[in-house]
Amino acid sequence: LEAMLAARKLEEVKIFDLNEERCKAFAEEMQKELAKYGATIIPAKDSDDCIEDADLIVTVTPSAKPVFDGTKVKAGATISCVGTYEPHKHELDPAVLPRASKIICDSKEAALSETGDLLIPIADGIITEEDVLGSLGDVINGKIKGRENDEEIIVYETVGVAAQDLVAAKVIYDKAVEAGKGFRWGE
């Protein structure tokens, strides 16, 4: 959450969890901890409330069924699905996929072998493998155009790529060493 707030000026962040008390407590804690970013962080009453008029929808769940109604996603939204990394799990409602202008992954090969968010709709004939355009790297390198207009719905599916995790860990390690933080094991 903090990374998103640091990267982009967000006015309002709605959070939803099936456990209402946990959701409320998390929203309150994040409102205090992340106040410097100026966003209002509030618990949503349900997943539909959470995505209503949302420009950015981020799902981070281990769900085996969709966590929001894909027909309610507004034009121009970006959806980032982080939680489903197994073929039987899908937090993304397949109903949004035919409306999506672009479906991008961290790794197309990994996503097409690991996430039910794509495998289930492909098996059901809702989309094809060709509808999955490529990787985020392809967007960054200009092989695939990013957002081309304010009406596009863009879906980003991430299953995790070990090489990216290692690079991130190395950057964090180097910064910790430079700042004199942490400790060395075995010394």
Regions found by a protein language model. Give the residues of each.
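An anion/phosphate-binding loop that grips the pyrophosphate of nucleotide cofactors and donors
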Residues: 53-54, 100
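NAD(P)-dependent dehydrogenase/reductase Rossmann-like domain
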Residues: 95, 126-187
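Short, well-ordered coil/turn residues at beta-beta hairpins
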Residues: 58-61, 81-82, 106, 169
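Rossmann-fold NAD(P)-binding glycine/threonine-rich loop
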Residues: 73-75, 82-145
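Short glycine-rich anion-binding loops that position phosphate/pyrophosphate groups of nucleotides
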Residues: 62-65, 84-85, 110, 161
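NAD(P)-binding Rossmann-fold cofactor-contacting core
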Residues: 7-34
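Rossmann-fold NAD(P) dinucleotide-binding segment
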Residues: 48-49, 56, 63-78, 91-94
